Amino acid sequence: MLHKSILQVALKCSCIDMTDCLRQFLAFGAKASSWCRKHILWSVESIEESEEVQEEEHSRILPEIISMTLNISIKLLPSAAKCITVDMVHTIGDFISELLSLTESSMADKKIHGAGADIARAAPIFLDEAAKLCRVYSEAAKAEDCKMSIPDEDTTVKHSERGLASEVTRITSSTIQTLCKLGTYAASSGGSQVALLNVSWKGTVSLLQSGKGMIEEKVNVREIILTLLSLSIESMRVAAETWCTPLLETLGSSEARRAFLPIKFFLINAVRICSAYPSEAMAIYKNIIRCALAITSASILFSKKPQLKAANEALVELLEPTLFVLLDTLMKSSEVTPESKCQLARYFFENEEANGSDHMGQANREEINLPSLDCIFSMDSDVDLRNRALLPAELIVFLHFLNASPWLTEEVVIELSKKLQSLLNILTSEDIYSYVLGFEIPALYGADHSPAVVWQPVYTCLIQAMKTFMLSAVSSSAAWNELEAFLLENLFHPHFLCMEIVTELWCFFMRYAETETSINIVNQLFLLLKIVASPEGVLVPLSALRKVAHSVCIILSYASSATVDQVYTCMLNDENPSKSSVLHLALVMEGFPFDSLSGGIKELAVKKMFTSFAGYLESYSKNHRAINVPTSSWGVIGFPVHALASALQRCEIKDDSIIDEKSITTMFKFTISLINMYGTASDSVAHSVLVHFV
């Protein structure tokens, strides 16, 4: 009771100007704090029955004494911020240290904190004032350091300024450490310590920002970032475990947002610290990526449950932008070396590269289909990413970097271009390509001030990201060489999805590339077409020749008229006419875009086909309706028939003068003859001839 009475008097005196007696008040406050901490320890250890009455009285009065001590300190700190001398700062440092220890002990001890609502109100205010004091001292110390850089004859002053910086560093570092501990405690309190949570982490961030260049040796910045990441993942894990149990009702948007707001708070503070200390953040880039993968995996889990649609949309709206800003902070910083940025880009799919594409469909099949929450939300950055549960999330995060490629450095763009093959490799996994083809994911679109959540297929997101990356790669010759090699090597990828993606990229390239560039690329494709050309394969739909021709025709359908003209001219001017005919037929049968030819060349092409067909019919009539077998090894039976029939299906012919009545009559006679031959064929030779036409 005596201590309480003394503190009541001190609290009244603290309301007046204390400048002249500040040192005495600080010493008094430090002793009061020390006394309170000792009695907190005593109250925890006091368990004997004989002491129960005394303990009850003690537990009732002690919270009041602690609250008054904190309130006195709140009054003292603004005055202390005005007294910036080495001796005074040293005294204030001892005072702050005692008060921080008292605050930590009283907030963490349930026995004391549960009995004192006043402590819960006073502690955040004291911590906020302590953070303000540290910021003022940090600015003063930096200003004095600037003065020290100017030659001065007074060496005594120089010595005292160095002492000031040392004392400020001591106070600031101890304050940061206490704020982190209390912030972690408040995060685990189930939402009952919102004020303490806000003050603790905001104070931590502001002191790290203002103390940069002074506190790095005293404060483990990496550990603070890891703590925030861990809190984010743990909060997401709790929400996911709660929601992924069978739900009787659809989850509401407000409930989902309430669960995600603390996570956003942790991520925002992590972003601010990483922005101030990018080199420290880069040292733990694997943990940062792991956090991104965990939260993205949660989004993927939610997308599988219609009841969690609101949760998924809230996650994309509240968390995903901040999550990607956290990753972008490392890539944008000028303090991070290009090699470190490339190292981050190389991290994606590295386990899949180590195991090879054959591993994708073998081991861990159960883990792919039944991903565990424990695996997804593990904070161990060394967990083997061969666990398939994280691959869909890794794909989504990688697509973010492809979308961000316009502002990435050239070195990083080159590294990303080298990862495209690994991207295709993981798409061959059954569960990955089924996810790409069968799922929709939410994404933010629209103006910055009012973005809207739009659901779109994963495949669409994948294609858009790769197209964005193509546009970025053009500005770097090295990146474009990698990309061009990737497109050429995978144009005929054995997996249907990969081939579809690469073909789509080729079409995008042909649509927007300069004519000279597109002609050079198509010439390379045409050389490949010549390599696989054979008379045996031209009439076999799934032969190598027809597959290549099919891809070339799709690509040419998006090319300019000049490019299509170039390909057609190359076919006409080939040194081997018979081989040229085979190439011509393969392209025509796979849909060569005649309508994309310029006017004069298209007219010439159509006339040539009709002329060839008319000549074939004339020969057929002169031969007494016997089908000629070509003498050349490159000849194709009925070549003019196949060419014209295929062209007529896809080419719009407006000139009626090309076909006269006599030609039409001959066509019908030829068709009737083929039908009759098919019905009367008796030997293998006749049947083989008919197969070429049917």
List each language-model region with its residue ranges.
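Extended coiled-coil alpha-helical stalks
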Residues: 18, 30, 47-63, 78-89, ...
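Charged, low-complexity interaction regions
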Residues: 81-85, 111, 191, 216-219, ...
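Short inter-helical turns and helix N-cap capping residues of alpha-solenoid HEAT/ARM repeat scaffolds
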Residues: 14, 18, 55, 62, ...
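Solenoid-like repeat scaffolds
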Residues: 472-473, 489-494, 510-512, 527-531
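HEAT-repeat alpha-solenoid elements in large eukaryotic scaffold proteins
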Residues: 2-10, 14, 28-50, 65-79, ...
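Cytosolic small-GTPase signaling regions in large eukaryotic proteins
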Residues: 514-521, 527, 531-592
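Extended, charged low-complexity segments
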Residues: 226, 282, 286, 296, ...
